[in-house]
Amino acid sequence: MMRSHYCGQLNETLEGQEITLCGWVHRRRDHGGVIFLDIRDRDGLAQVVFDPDRAESFAAADRVRSEYVVKITGKVRLRPAGAVNKNMASGGIEVLGYELEVLNESETPPFPLNEYSDVGEETRLRYRFLDLRRPEMAEKLRLRSRMTTSIRRFLDENGFLDVETPILTRATPEGARDYLVPSRTHAGSFFALPQSPQLFKQLLMVAGFDRYYQIAKCFRDEDLRADRQPEFTQIDIETSFLDEKEIMGLTEQMIRNLFKEVLDLEFGDFPHMTFEEAMRRYGSDKPDLRNPLELVDVADQLKDVDFKVFSGPANDPKCRIAALRVPGGASMPRKQIDDYTKFVGIYGAKGLAYIKVNERANGVDGLQSPIVKNIPLDNLNAILDRVGAVDGDIVFFGADKAKIVSEALGALRIKLGHDLNLLTCEWAPMWVVDFPMFEENDDGSFSALHHPFTAPKCSPAELEANPAGALSRAYDMVLNGTELGGGSIRIHRKEMQQAVFRLLGINEAEQEEKFGFLLDALKYGAPPHGGLAFGLDRLVMLMTGAQSIREVIAFPKTQSAADVMTQAPGVVDAKALRELHIRLRETPKAE
């Protein structure tokens, strides 16, 4: 081996020992004839001192520059008391350099790697191999590795088998667009890259493997956001002969173990909340419980008011009127309220009514709002009592279709929590359960809220008689308002699977064409089974405090699903296209 130690391994116990380091010159400093080099490797930093008394090594140190790759041999010694650097793991020692060999030189990097600089993300991604040298970026990937090691160890110890499933498969309707791969040997046919290993892991349960897991690559061709990538990684889990309570308990234990091992944080038992309660109180199926703000229904107090903006929705069973109290918000300037009004408009809200509670004892005169003149004082007081309003508060209102009100005020709740620093703790894990089986589309048809293979809490006959009211055996783990993972008990009987397909508008011919292999498998003694999948990238993002999952993936794509480093996707030559039986059509020019 070229080295004896990593930089991060050096400490006071090695005093007096001769060691050899290999790494990059992170920083070079010349202090009164003594040269200091900070050497960096994947494990950390170490300070090496070169003294003019050793002429050859001193001359070599004088020639090196930032990002040169070097091999250094020297002796570990304690730093003087006033020179200890508590910000470095090796800050109590330094290395007196004897020998320095330059293994490779470096051009000046396009951005500094040894200090913070506000570099555009595209530049960082273009030179990702340099960006990853920065200690804060390397630390994120080291933590990611520790996380997957912890997860694999836990699952191995609990009897799970790591089984790989196909990457080249066939397209199935799972919500997002598939990435398609043309087949050279089957002209006109295409493979699809998997959006998840869902059906294969269910087939492994039919095959009797009982407990499966995989750190799986998945692919979705969809519009990207801060927490989405076209290719992403799932911690994929499936079990047989366990019910939802047992699966949730096992995976909760895995996450608690992960946080303890990696961050030394201990969580208690995760609270459970139904989908209905989460939407009613927080306007979201993944509520952030660190935020104390809650939505409160007040339609019953507004049915008879002479104000159609409220009385209309209050008397419509498909609508909702909810109030959101913000403690101390009465001092909020009008511009800030206008900004929040524009914000809820993103979610379809037509406006944002409000009441500033200046002095409740003065009745209507103590309230500041354009709407109070339209609401009787008794009703106003009933609303303010219900939301717990006191002097100095502001109360926002949403009145519209139930979905719009929940989403708009739910998003406003999150924004207010961050803008006003209302969060009460650092971590708030939970489970959301009892999801609806389906969501109804505008045309009256149904879509699966999770996926078509989720088992309902009723019989096939009951499901088909009342699909809108059916609940599923699904469960989501949520942390700080982010869905960490979602899962369910699966359908293991053919007649139930066919009933769900029918309700989704998939006729028998299409069922056979797209899911014939699954329906066949369900005829041959499929066991009760269920599972869960965690988004690894999202989990790493939360545990490292990163702002985007692009920060925790070694080589991510941009928000336009491109790789600016390798220039992917790229043009394919005509010969390759002919072999794939593909002909490109020119895009018509705009007139």
Swiss-Prot record:
ATP binds at R220, D221, E222, Q229, E483, G535, L536, D537, R538. L-aspartate binds at E174, R220, H450, R490. GO terms for molecular function: aspartate-tRNA ligase activity; aspartate-tRNA(Asn) ligase activity; ATP binding; nucleic acid binding. Keywords: Aminoacyl-tRNA synthetase, ATP-binding, Cytoplasm, Ligase, Nucleotide-binding, Protein biosynthesis. Homodimer. GO terms for cellular component: cytoplasm. HAMAP family: Asp_tRNA_synth_type1. Its EC number is 6.1.1.23. It is found in: Cytoplasm. The keyword Cytoplasm applies. This is Aspartate--tRNA(Asp/Asn) ligase. The lineage of its organism: Bacteria, Pseudomonadati, Pseudomonadota, Gammaproteobacteria, Pseudomonadales. Coiled coil: none annotated. Pfam families: GAD (PF02938), tRNA-synt_2 (PF00152), tRNA_anti-codon (PF01336). One of its GO terms (biological process) is aspartyl-tRNA aminoacylation. The record marks H31, G82 as: Important for tRNA non-discrimination.
